[in-house]
């Protein structure tokens, strides 16, 4: 009897030690993608940073840091049921802060994409912005929303709310812009991003997400074998500095992606637009603009069988094929070296340089109005 009691006590002591190291301190459990929350605990510009983990009922997982509102990882099953990380990024806050312009997974604003010559005129007043890309303003400048700390509140296991007050004059933009972004990991394995914003002075707004996707599940691979479809009859051609010059049909050009094509098939075609972009880096004008229920784009990896569908209520979609990813390689999560064209971005948006091109849909937001936008990245297999 004494031996039995002793055995039970020993077992209880052993179980009570689970989750602790040799010194008795609680050990940290990694996320599905191998991230450690402690690697994101810091302070930037005097504000705390952290990693937030979203999980749905099917076992999928998405991780977001409030520095830049960045989507750090998305774990979804491949055709064999293996959980696979489909976005690029870093595994600690220090790397993100050291490399802000890579924009991995970042929220982008106040104006996503380019504004020509870093200036625009609104209601008779000219506003000068940072010129951080060939004399133009790209993604709100070097200190855009991708490089600030957002206030974060985890609503439930599947939902994260981020808020940020972009002050009047920040990066040259007029008006105090009060922004709310909701990340939700739905039970059908979709990352649903909803944006809201209000202003106290007329301004321009174009918010988006700059996640880099590679669906293959092969660390360090390119996306040249992925297939892509974009439901768009027209697109914005650009000049040598990637400023739109108008609207043209995709028919008869390598920009025709209305039926699925292999990304690498025409990416190095001497077609002038692909030469200017160094590959695909253009805005497609969506046929179902404003309809969140229609598939705007579809990407498939033949290796993993993972499918990503994009839904949005925005009129445009920027397809960027990782042309500027360094050929020398960037070391990302778990030490993986990211190659040239190691991922693609699908950024839902209004057209680039709209503040200077009155024929494009308006991006002006005035007091009393509410800016709303939504982007859904939905994952499945085939």
Task: Outline where the language-model segments fall.
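Sec-dependent signal peptide hydrophobic core
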Residues: 5-10
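C-terminal motif of bacterial Sec signal peptides marking the signal peptidase cleavage site
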Residues: 13-16
């Amino acid at each position: 009897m004494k031996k039995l009691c002793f055995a039970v006590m020993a077992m209880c002591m052993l179980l009570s030690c689970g989750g602790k190291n040799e010194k008795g301190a609680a050990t940290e459990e990694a996320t599905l993608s191998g991230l450690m929350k402690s690697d994101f605990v810091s302070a930037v510009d005097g504000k705390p940073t952290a990693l937030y983990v979203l999980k749905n009922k099917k076992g999928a997982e998405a991780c977001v840091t409030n520095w830049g509102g960045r989507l750090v990882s998305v774990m979804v099953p491949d055709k064999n049921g293996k959980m696979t990380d489909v976005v690029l990024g870093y595994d600690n806050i220090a790397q993100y802060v050291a490399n802000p312009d890579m924009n991995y997974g970042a929220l982008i604003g106040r104006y996503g994409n380019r504004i020509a010559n870093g200036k625009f005129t609104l209601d008779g007043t000219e506003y000068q912005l940072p010129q951080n890309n060939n004399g133009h303003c790209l993604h709100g400048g070097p200190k855009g929303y991708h490089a600030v700390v957002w206030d974060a509140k985890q609503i439930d296991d599947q939902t994260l709310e981020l808020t940020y007050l972009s002050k009047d004059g920040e990066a040259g933009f007029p008006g105090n812009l009060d922004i709310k972004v909701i990340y939700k990991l739905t039970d059908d394995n979709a990352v649903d991003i909803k944006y809201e914003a209000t202003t106290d002075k007329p301004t321009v707004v174009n918010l988006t997400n700059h996640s880099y996707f590679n669906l293959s599940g092969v660390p360090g691979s390119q996306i040249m074998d992925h297939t892509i479809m974009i439901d768009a009859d027209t697109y914005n051609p650009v000049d040598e500095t990637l400023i739109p010059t108008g609207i043209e049909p995709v028919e008869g050009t390598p920009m025709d992606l209305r039926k699925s094509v292999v990304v690498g098939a025409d990416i190095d075609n001497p077609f002038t637009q692909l030469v200017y972009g160094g590959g695909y880096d253009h805005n497609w004008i969506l046929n179902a603009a404003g309809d969140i229920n229609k598939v705007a784009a579809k990407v498939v990896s033949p290796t993993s069988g993972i499918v990503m569908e994009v839904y949005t209520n925005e009129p445009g979609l920027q397809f960027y094929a990782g042309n500027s990813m360094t050929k020398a390689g960037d070391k990302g999560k778990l030490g993986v070296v990211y190659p040239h064209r190691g991922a693609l971005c699908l950024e839902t948006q209004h057209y680039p340089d709209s503040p200077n091109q009155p024929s494009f849909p308006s991006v002006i937001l005035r007091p009393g109005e509410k800016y709303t936008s939504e982007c859904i990245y939905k994952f499945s297999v085939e």
